[in-house]
Amino acid sequence: LKLNPYAKTMRRNTILRQXRXHKIRMDKAAALKAKSGEKGVPDKKPVVEKKGKKAIGKKAVGVKKQKKPLVGKKAVVTKKPAAEKKPAXKKPTTEEKKAVA
């Protein structure tokens, strides 16, 4: 068995990429908190209270509505690379090589 010489590098890069993405996410969250604090919008605190007391069904509906457009976007994105891959396959070239051999 030949081990992938880049496995260690790939693993390290994956960890570093995840750490970078996490840091960016946390920075964005902190910025949002700072903005909401400056505006003095008390919307988030009542939402926290509602989560514990009621409106669990409302939360689920809101989450579903957010997920559906994302799924649609993913499907569109998935279709485009599939269309690009078909011309790039170059199957006749492989057949020509076999014919030459």
From Swiss-Prot:
GO cellular component, one term: ribonucleoprotein complex
Main location: cytoplasm
Numbered residues of crosslink Glycyl lysine isopeptide (Lys-Gly) (interchain with G-Cter in SUMO2): 2
The keyword Ribosomal protein is annotated on this UniProt entry: yes
Cross-link (Glycyl lysine isopeptide (Lys-Gly) (interchain with G-Cter in SUMO1)): 35
Mod. after translation: Citrullinated by PADI4.
N6-acetyllysine: modified positions: 8, 28, 35
Subunit structure: Component of the large ribosomal subunit. May bind IPO9 with low affinity. Interacts with RBM3.
Function: Component of the large ribosomal subunit. The ribosome is a large ribonucleoprotein complex responsible for the synthesis of proteins in the cell.
Protein's name according to its UniProt entry: Large ribosomal subunit protein uL4
Source organism of the structure: Sus scrofa (Pig)
